[in-house]
Amino acid sequence: MEEYQKKIKEKLNVVPLEPGCYLMKDRNDQVIYVGKAKRLRNRLRSYFTGAHDAKTTRLVGEIRNFEFIVTSSETESLLLELNLIKQYQPRYNILLKDDKSYPFIKITKEKHPRLLVTRTVKKNSGKYFGPYPNAYSAQETKKLLDRIYPFRKCDNMPDKLCLYYHIGQCMGPCVYDVDLEKYAQMTKEITDFLNGEDKTILNHLEERMNKASEQLDFEQAKEYRDMIQHIHNLTKKQKIMSSDNTIRDVFGYSVSKGWMCVQVFFVRQGNMIKRDATMIPIQQTEEEEFYTFIGQFYSLNQHLIPKEVHVPKNLDKDIIQSVVDTKIVQPVRGAKKDMINLANHNAEVQLDNKFELIARDESRTIKAIEELGERMGIQTPIRIEAFDNSNIQGVDPVSAMVTFVDGKPHKKDYRKYKIKTVEGPDDYKSMREVVRRRYTRVLNEGLPLPDLIIVDGGKGHMNGVMDVLENELGLDIPVAGLQKNDKHQTSELLYGASAEIVPLKKNSQAFYLLHRIQDEVHRFAITFHRQTRQKTGLKSVLDDIDGIGTKRKTSLLRTFGSIKKMKEASFDELRQAGLPEKVAKNLQNALQNK
């Protein structure tokens, strides 16, 4: 039994049978999972006994220590769990800070308010309405309101009247004193309209349409008629879910094979305008997973808390109330209960449709890294960092690093490097510099170390990297090299001090993963190098010499590698590089005078 396993076993004996939260830590003392439990000892022991699904097995395999915090109640545990997840952002927790941002219409909280479409919700900065099903829907509604209510349009107050004032869509607060009561009245009418009360705005438009008709301004009357029709269309587009206009979110969920799907219906003005589905691998009871989910849904994500939240009857209303500060409803009959049933059914369908794909993808990527670890004789490389260099004969040399976690790209940990200490095209020294910079910073900042480092290259690259890691930084991390064939395709994985070929079948999941990693790091490095070249434009003394354009400049740099080497070249060597006599003389004179 490993030493850490003995310590964990001893520690489990003193964990109390009380509610609380626990923090699982890896070999780098990083928190990788936060959970809660009614009885801490039972929950923690369950991780280290019996069989688990693939995800929990991987989690347990990484645990080297744990901590726990006792709380006075299950509700307090939930609140603490949410705060700990925010603080540590563990990778095995379901963090709902994703890219599911929806558009809202906002009335700013300013002396002279503005009407905006935004995907960012900030507390105490104004009134928000939505979410809208898409940006087009929100923008069309805003355009309609802009034509009726002359709110300020400018971000900053200008010192003169703008076009919007002259077309009647602004009251010109930059120049004139505007009655603030007028703004208050407009804000109320817009609020009523966006909350489903459209009678006032329809009456205004009908009055304007009739007045325009009486004045024989039929073009203007038609415009008002179209606006009225647009409002009617807005209220008819979505399926009617309720006869009242209360702003509510309706939650349902389904559980199958260790996964939970939570379905949310956004109901506005009696219509279901949007729905959201989230897949969650279950680490706790289904009720506990739901409490964690709904707490994160409103605290970590940009979701407005509605006037009502509807949830299934089997859940503890008081626990949900502790993390969602609004009215919690658990319908037992009628149309509102039907909405809960519909959300549950949609969650079940979503789970059935996607579970097989998720399981297949999970199996494929996990199988790939497990196979890779077995073939190399190392522990399963959960975290892989790969490096590649890019330059044109030493010009604007750069390097890039990509990170794969659980066999998938982890793009927030990608890094770009400009080579600082190497002159000319020297791949080995460039790789040494970048690896030295990367892992010096990792050590200084306590960042997670990789389980495997891959370099795009052979034995020379590998030896240089291992020398830096072992002899300069004192690190023992497996280093492998990826080589390509004549067609520039991934062909071999090299490993060990003698850079031996690791036997991998070309059709294996492990080989496919390596191919993907090599392509990704190459793409990332090439893109960065291209961006760097575009910024510098290969600016040099060559730009000012008659007879040397972009093509000749690039050709010279490829031939000689640097301006310094060109300066050391003889006249004949410059001529042999393809320069006409006059141009070669111009270049030599320019470089000698430099």
UniProtKB/Swiss-Prot annotation:
GO molecular function: DNA binding; excinuclease ABC activity
GO CC, alphabetical: cytoplasm; excinuclease repair complex
Subcellular location as annotated: Cytoplasm
Signal sequence segment: none
Chief site of localization: cytoplasm
Record flagged with keyword Nucleotide-binding: no
Keywords of this entry: Cytoplasm, DNA damage, DNA excision, DNA repair, Excision nuclease, SOS response
Occurrences of domain UVR (ranges): 199-234
Domain GIY-YIG: 17-94
One Pfam family this sequence matches: UVR
InterPro entries linked: GIY-YIG_endonuc (IPR000305), GIY-YIG_endonuc_sf (IPR035901), GIY-YIG_UvrC_Cho (IPR047296), RuvA_2-like (IPR010994), UVR_dom (IPR001943), UVR_dom_sf (IPR036876), UvrABC_protein_C (IPR050066), UvrC (IPR004791)
Entry's Gene Ontology BP terms: nucleotide-excision repair; SOS response
Record carries keyword Lyase: no
Subunit-structure text: Interacts with UvrB in an incision complex.
PANTHER family hit by this protein: UVRABC SYSTEM PROTEIN C, UVRC/OXIDOREDUCTASE
Function text: The UvrABC repair system catalyzes the recognition and processing of DNA lesions. UvrC both incises the 5' and 3' sides of the lesion. The N-terminal half is responsible for the 3' incision and the C-terminal half is responsible for the 5' incision.
Family assignment from sequence similarity: Belongs to the UvrC family.
Protein name per Swiss-Prot or TrEMBL: UvrABC system protein C
